[in-house]
A protein has these predicted regions:
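Class I S-adenosyl-L-methionine-dependent methyltransferase catalytic core
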Residues: 1-176
Length: 176
């Protein structure tokens, strides 16, 4: 696992031993950031960050990053990876839903990749909508192992991309 582009391009990241965490593959991460294109200066939330690879990739490309995970092991590994590249990212040990319900921040990009067996998609989209956590023209990306649609009255799915076992659903606020 490595940083693909930006100021930390090529830097290797630590990974978990075993199969506790399912990090997004380098190939899927590269495809995701090709779609996002330019994240420089954008506020980026990585929910259920696991190893921190997505958030650190975003930071390497110039984003202002917040990473959240409930697992103390994940947070420790994310901090280890962040320290390796002198990251300025904010790393928080918290339940994703609790974080969304209590944060005072808003974001340009919210990336969420909870364990596939835990389906938080609808709840995350609902809270983001209710609390107006997405900045104008912001985007939510929800990673899953199957096609799902968590659209609401105000936040709609705009596209879906599949990379191997990874399916990214892209959501935006619907403006009248």
């Amino acid at each position: 696992m490595r940083i693909i582009a930006g100021k930390h391009k090529g830097r290797k990241l630590y990974d978990f031993n075993g199969d506790k965490i399912r990090p997004t593959s380098d190939k899927a991460r590269e495809a995701l950031f090709a779609i996002l294109y330019n994240v420089n200066g954008l506020s980026f939330l990585d929910l259920c960050c696991g190893t921190g690879a997505i958030g650190l990739e975003a930071e390497s490309r110039g984003a202002i990053v917040t990473m959240v995970d409930l697992s103390k092991e994940s947070v420790a590994l994310t901090k280890k990876n962040a320290n390796q590249i002198s990251s300025q990212a904010e790393i928080i040990c918290s339940d994703a839903i609790k974080f969304l319900k209590t944060t005072n921040k808003t974001f340009d990009i919210i990336f969420s990749d909870p364990p596939y067996e835990i389906d938080l998609g609808q709840e995350i989209i609902n809270i983001v909508e209710q609390r107006n956590l997405l900045n104008k023209n912001g985007i939510i990306i929800y990673e899953k192992d199957k096609s799902v649609d968590y659209s609401t009255e105000k936040i709609i799915k705009t596209k879906e991309k599949k990379y191997g076992k990874n399916i990214f659903g892209f959501y935006m606020v619907k403006y009248e």
